[in-house]
């Protein structure tokens, strides 16, 4: 269970190489083991240059995909995981764990402790999950709180020293690189015994516990016979516990109001020490019934120093917060659109913001627009072929608003207007963006009185909640729309 | 050279990292390793720079110190540098330990005879034990971090030399129980324990007191090089618990060796000790611990895997990739012994849930989905090593894992695979209220094709569509309800976007005939029904070259005829000719002749005309099987050569006559003495089946008239062939050598040419009898001949030795057909006609026991020496 090498590569489309190796680290002792384990099937880790080229080709990130290239485009080359075989100098380097996120490619080569011919199943290679965790750890470190390029460069320059702590020999010791940074900074602190490895020091100061619940709601609405609208809530509970002592114990309970929607698919942080079996088994896979466990959801844990995600959950609320329809028809040279949105009465009518984005793909710039709206203002981005309906902080008393109008487009030019493979012809969507503070759709809240802390001093407990939209689509009901299998379940 | 400045080093390291091989090949390469070691002691360089030098040495020791002795020297130097550090806190101690360990382990210098190893190992163990190493070697503030580092170094050495720390198990256990740093010690102990158990079981030994003996690290040292040697340097895989990974390594399993009750108790206590404190480890370290202990305990009697249960209950709620993966490893290792049927169902549910949980990143989803399809079931039904839906994974559970057009390509393909597996099982499933997966699959594929058909869309969309079609064709072969609409849809896609022709050709190459054949038919119909002059002509021709065959000839030829007028450039003409070639191969003749003739006249490009003419000639002259071979893929050309080269090579192989070793043997039978000419009887024999054999003979020295070739339609080994008759037309009565050439076709259709060993025509082979004189007139006839020889001819007397068979035997064996007058057993008169018009007359009279005097006359004096030799050789020739 070790990594032979790790790379960070920035993806730079339009440049000659289409990318630059920003960081790489090799582990020669692991490489030596790979040579013994893999035997005749051993393929050495290449230098950065060839690796970069082969990886970008495999990930289809080179600019040139004009022609059919069999080694890339053949129908039988099917990758179903983020684990690749790279052709380098006539040999295939496998397995290479790699993914692209925010224009940065994260890649590593886990050690396989046996021959590679025939290829062992991925699930049997312990280094694969470790490789993912390693790359996720680096990604979290680079992008936590990072705002601009110079901060990114600073963090990249810290990586060599951090990996000397977190992964000195290719076997990952801690995926949380921030821990290693703190460890380097506070190396002189004498650690008492039984200090957890995931907690590099102890907190000194006023005890406080902060709990914030963020719910994201996503939805696909079709307004069609035979296709069900779908929506889902995904919650994240984040905690920051500033408590004295090596191993303070905390229990947080999440509660629901009487008509709240049960939490399902709960995943917890590894610091949670035990879980009620009702929490473990409550799942969205099963059909819902009244007997579903509805809390309180108790999470006993020993907190790490940093802010962490105590748990994730999903929930199926009975109605979507905003129900709408979108009708778009092509009429000779123009499009006629009609939009209707209705806020459900049970939802808190106090938004931080609420907007409907109405994009028109695969068309030219907007040249003419006539519209009528019952509420809010419309902003027009002619070159981007985009309308934004700014609804504001509150829906009107009727809770229902509408927009109708006609749009005319100029000639299409490929560079400026967005291409979309799905929104062709009259297939189109509008996407809602909104945020409501101090509110959750499930009703889920962390009762401050139910937070139990077994540590010296009475901590100050603060709790926050918010609801935000994410992938909230309303499809044109007058044209075909992509459906999920779930939408066919009527 | 003095020490380099910080900037000079930064520049040098940058140049090295850009391309280590290029740097090492350059002028500075040789000195880099030496300079690095010496500058580590320079007082002018900052610690930060020195750390970067050490970091480099940790990454590229093989380049800096390419052999074991150089690595040994480097490790010694690094240790010296460590010892020489002033007794104050320094950022160098940790990296120096790491670098020395790396140099020894990666350089292959680690061993009982290595001085550096014998210094490093006690130092590391001393640091790990937190013992006082004297002289302020370790400042108090660094003690704790160095203790952890020493454990990491020891773990790496143990990884590279399994069994090295077998003697230190007791010590490590003791340290873990006291105040040592939990994570490094736990991982080190678990690894050493695993390796020791594996090695001990292999040599049939027990743990003995290893887990309890506390060796003093300052003593002789607990290094167990013997155990390392017994391990034969062979590294132990961590994941053999996986059934599929285990195949082919028979002697791997830990033979269920029984430990003594004492040993078993200690082992159990050690494992429990490790597991109980595992919550103090980081999640990734916990996962490692579980993998190691799972492997250590697998197959050990008396060690119930239930020890793991408390940890599993704690971890089942997390979605940490490494932890869930480790749990699956335990599942694979212990099966039902650790996971009851209910546990199994719960684990699969958690896994299914994690594979779609919106809070997790897409790469995690994909890996979990792979884990679902490779789930180590307690009672697996299907073949091992193949992805399949576990039995417990019903349609209800999969609902959220099905693909939609909104997924990215990888997620779509992974989920599509699952959907295909569901469709394959659908027939057995009861039709519930769920919508039909097969119908959903059809819709999805239609959506993918629609996107691929978008004008100007990226190639990735097309590739995805064809990958999906291929996946479906593989998983659902034999399901016409799926394949029929797929074929129909693909044909429509081609109609919409002919530029996808290369993808179609690739798909046809990859899929089984079940999809390929009907798809070919449909695509051919789509192409030939077009007018043959649109802008996509080059794609149509590419497609047609793949799908054209003997069926629907006239439509295809009509299309080509129409297209020919529009093939104005080289590319198109080549495309057109490729289709002709495909038709030629498929055995199309009729209309193709006309087309090729037209092309040979009409095409603008001379190369095109030449090719058309060549194809025409081939078509006109070669039989269908030969044509197939001539145009078939060439065996001679390597696969990557261009098609033109391949074509030429193919022609060379197929149309030229190949020099080959002789596959046929000829032997000379007894000659026939009838008719006006001497005739040789040849017996052919084949080593392999050969066809259309033509034997050509050439007479050396033009002694005979040129010989006709002999033809044999077919020869097979083991099947007796009729003898071949070769009439000779001598120009003078003399023996001769015949050169023999064979020309034949092999069963693969190649025409070969071979030299056979020469045949020798003997003097006697030319003998012909004179016409038989009337009864009783023999003597007169003979005397007349005898007298006619002189005076132009020659006369001689020869002693012909006789063998045991006597004169009678000799005559009956060799001269019987030529005897004119016989008075057995003493006197014979022999008259031989030698074509073209010579005669040889022999009187054999008054034979003695050992010989007979022969009086001979001939009208051709040149025959005399030949006759003499012949007679003298007769006795020996018996």
From Swiss-Prot, chain A:
| Expression by tissue | Expressed in various tumor cell lines including Jurkat, Hep-G2 and HeLa.
- List the subcellular locations: Cytoplasm, Cytosol; Late endosome membrane; Lysosome membrane
**Record's bilayer topology term:** Peripheral membrane protein
Organism lineage reads as: Eukaryota, Metazoa, Chordata, Craniata, Vertebrata
- The yes or no answer to whether the keyword Ribosomal protein is present is no
Q: List UniProt keywords, sorted A-Z.
A: Cytoplasm, Endosome, Lysosome, Membrane, Protein transport, Transport
Q: Which organism is it from?
A: Homo sapiens (Human)
Q: Where's the MHD domain? A: 206-476
Query: Assembly state and interactors?
Result: Probably part of the adaptor protein complex 5 (AP-5) a tetramer composed of AP5B1, AP5M1, AP5S1 and AP5Z1.
Q: Which GO terms describe its cellular component?
A: AP-5 adaptor complex; AP-type membrane coat adaptor complex; cytosol; late endosome; late endosome membrane; lysosomal membrane; lysosome; membrane
The organism's place on the tree of life at top rank = Eukaryota
Q: What is this protein called?
A: AP-5 complex subunit mu-1
> In this record, what's one Pfam family?
Adap_comp_sub
List the GO biological process terms.
Answer: endosomal transport; protein transport; vesicle-mediated transport
Q: Which family does it belong to?
A: Belongs to the adaptor complexes medium subunit family.
- CDD domains, per this entry? AP_MuD_MHD
Q: What is its main location?
A: cytoplasm
Q: What does this protein do?
A: As part of AP-5, a probable fifth adaptor protein complex it may be involved in endosomal transport. According to PubMed:18395520, it may play a role in cell death.
Swiss-Prot record, chain B:
GO CC annotation: AP-5 adaptor complex; AP-type membrane coat adaptor complex; late endosome; lysosomal membrane
Q: What InterPro entries does the record tag this protein with? A: AP5B1, AP5B1_barrel, AP5B1_C, AP5B1_middle, AP5B1_N
The organism sits in which domain of life? Eukaryota
Tell me which Pfam families the record gives: AP5B1_barrel, AP5B1_C, AP5B1_middle, AP5B1_N
Instruction: Summarize subunit and interaction data from the UniProt record for this chain.
Output: Probably part of the adaptor protein complex 5 (AP-5), a tetramer composed of AP5B1, AP5M1, AP5S1 and AP5Z1. Interacts with ZFYVE26 and SPG11.
Keyword Transport found: yes
Q: What is the protein name given in its UniProt record?
A: AP-5 complex subunit beta-1
Q: Some GO term, biological process aspect, for this entry: which one? A: protein transport
Question: What ranges does the record give for the region Disordered, renumbered to this chain?
Answer: 234-260
Please describe what this protein does: As part of AP-5, a probable fifth adaptor protein complex it may be involved in endosomal transport.
Ordered alphabetically, the record's keywords are: Protein transport, Transport
Please tell me whether the keyword Signal is annotated for this protein. no
Organism listed in the record: Homo sapiens (Human)
Q: Where does this protein have compositionally biased stretches of type Basic and acidic residues?
A: 250-260
